[in-house]
Amino acid sequence: MTKEMRSFVPILINNGYREIRSNGSHFIYSNGNNQITVNKDLNKMVRRRLIKENNLVER
């Protein structure tokens, strides 16, 4: 798990997402309505895109 992924997980949790499963190199998070698939080798650019596309709040 990369540094970016370790810092992204708390953002997901603070926005109501929880890990529902992992398969190979991907983690699947859901908040009941939306689902986000995150690669374990997440990089900075993809992290920023996921935050923007899913309207996540960084706290």
Give a label for each model feature.
Residues 2-23, 28-59:
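Basic nucleic-acid-binding interfaces
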